[in-house]
A protein has these predicted regions:
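Coiled-coil dimerization/phosphotransfer module
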Residues: 1-173
Length: 173
């Protein structure tokens, strides 16, 4: 009984260490200097294809111009979503779609056909929190759709802030 308890404690410590390292890594997206979102998505997807047997379908449409800060956060969210799909979902396939929305907005979807996220684990990991914080920093919405044994889809939607142009100023007479 003591040996079993120790084995469980060691495995729990190992799992927590892996999660902590992954979370710290997620704070700094692994992108090359000056790399845009499309290039980063291609590079990270290619790297993941080389290191896993999970087929990944990547579709990138026309993308709007994004600022450097927005790009960094989007790349970080993508990295975390892809990592989660590979490491935790036990997915048989992953589909990634990135495109412009209403010409200036951006939409990213990372969907897998894995085991989904159990209700009691939703929003409890460092990775999910990190993605949500990144989305909030750029004013984006992050939606996670999941159900046990039905996979998970992470959807990021971003639109640039709207700027109102004031009407003509009339001088008082």
């Amino acid at each position: 009984h003591v040996v079993k308890t120790l084995e469980t404690a060691v495995e729990l410590a190992r799992t927590n260490m892996i999660e902590a390292r992954r979370s710290v890594g997620a704070l700094r997206p692994q992108s090359s200097e000056g790399e845009d979102v499309a290039a980063a998505l291609h590079r990270m997807t290619d790297l993941t294809r080389r290191t896993t047997d999970v087929p990944i379908d990547l579709t990138i449409g026309e993308l709007p111009p994004l600022g450097g800060g927005v790009e960094r956060e989007i790349i970080g969210i993508f990295q975390e979503a892809l990592t989660n799909a590979v490491r935790h979902a036990r997915a048989r396939k992953i589909a990634i779609h990135a495109s412009a929305v209403r010409s200036l907005g951006f939409r990213l979807s990372v969907a897998d056909d894995g085991r989904g996220i159990a209700k009691e684990h939703r929003g409890t990991g460092f990775g999910m929190t990190s993605m949500q914080e990144r989305a909030e920093r750029i004013g984006a919405s992050l939606t996670i759709v999941t159900a046990p044994r039905s996979g998970t889809e992470v959807v990021l939607a971003w639109e640039p802030p709207s700027f109102s142009i004031p009407g003509p100023v009339h001088a008082a007479r």
